[in-house]
Amino acid sequence: MRRYLSIIISSLFATTLLTSCSSNSNLPFNQGFVPSCAGLDASGISTNELLLDCLDGSGAVNFYSIRGPIVVNVWGSWCEGCRQEMPYFVELYQNKLFKNGEIKLLGVDIEESSRQVGVNFIKTYGMSWPHLEDLAGKTKILFGPGAPVTWFIDKDGKVLNKHIGTYTDPDQLFTQVEKAFGVKL
């Protein structure tokens, strides 16, 4: 009996040691981090007001005051299409034009049951750009019901293009960014 107990304990210890020390290089570099909205340019002047809280808990931002160039992706963790296309946005954000801030990326999480559900989604997919939340459904008038929806907004706050539905491959997303902002990714 002692022998079997010793084998079981040794096996459990080895399993714990091996799994806790292994790394998963497929995970995004920032898994577990909820980005701040501090880098958003919300300096635009607008007579409209649509206050949305940042998912990092740092406060509210008036959506109508955000200036681009910026890609705004409306998503929800419950949305199958959002889960499908999110790796494309993660890839897009790795591009130098996004990394150096020439073009910004903003997520808007809608229709969640709680903030934590959205935070968990961000952590799971490694979404390292700022995200606003709309638990109350205030953005339905602006974005329409459902997700995903992606907007392309210029430096003056003008909507250049709107894509309704799921991106089926990264090239489709990258091409729309290039056309909207006149850049080469």
Tell me the role of every PLM-derived stretch.
Residues V74-G76, V108-E111, D134-A136, H163-G165:
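Active-site-proximal beta-strand/loop segments in catalytic clefts of secreted hydrolases
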Residues I45-T47, I66-R67, N100-I103, G126, ...:
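Extracytoplasmic
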Residues R83-Y125, L135-I141:
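Structural microenvironment flanking redox-active thiols in thiol-disulfide oxidoreductases
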Residues G68-I70, W75-W78, G146:
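Short pre-active-site segment immediately N-terminal to redox-active cysteine/selenocysteine motifs
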Residues V71-V72, L105, T150:
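Hydrophobic beta-strand anchors of alpha/beta hydrolase catalytic cores
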Residues M1-D53, T175, K184-L185:
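N-terminal targeting signals for export/organelle localization
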Residues N120-M127, E133-L185:
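Thiol/disulfide oxidoreductase modules built on the thioredoxin-like
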Residues E49-I70:
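A short beta-strand-turn-helix
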